[in-house]
Amino acid sequence: MDPDCSCSTGGSCTCAGSCKCKECKCTSCKKSCCSCCPVGCAKCAQGCICKGASDKCSCCA
């Protein structure tokens, strides 16, 4: 379980716009706060959509 999410890590869930999940695909807000973003990236919870595993994220580059 992700400490910031009510579902299993990597699973689907519904969460608010303040979602801070690290691996969860948030279907309700269509956001994905993924591991490709560096720890502490404030923009991740603001709409970062990761297309796949990467060292960089479009919102944090």
Swiss-Prot record:
A divalent metal cation 2 binds at residues 7, 13, 15, 26. A divalent metal cation 5 binds at residues 34, 36-37, 50. A divalent metal cation 1 binds at residues 5, 7, 21, 24. Residues 1-29 are annotated as: Beta. A divalent metal cation 7 binds at residues 50, 57, 59-60. SUPFAM superfamilies: Metallothionein (SSF57868). Residues 30-61 are annotated as: Alpha. GO terms for molecular function: zinc ion binding. A divalent metal cation 6 binds at residues 37, 41, 44, 60. A divalent metal cation 4 binds at residues 33-34, 44, 48. GO terms for biological process: cellular response to zinc ion; negative regulation of growth. GO terms for cellular component: cytoplasm; nucleus. It comes from the Eukaryota. A divalent metal cation 3 binds at residues 15, 19, 24, 29. Keywords: Acetylation, Metal-binding, Metal-thiolate cluster, Zinc. The modification N-acetylmethionine is found at residue 1. Metallothioneins have a high content of cysteine residues that bind various heavy metals; these proteins are transcriptionally regulated by both heavy metals and glucocorticoids. Belongs to the metallothionein superfamily. Type 1 family. Class I metallothioneins contain 2 metal-binding domains: four divalent ions are chelated within cluster A of the alpha domain and are coordinated via cysteinyl thiolate bridges to 11 cysteine ligands. Cluster B, the corresponding region within the beta domain, can ligate three divalent ions to 9 cysteines. This is Metallothionein-1. The gene is MT1.
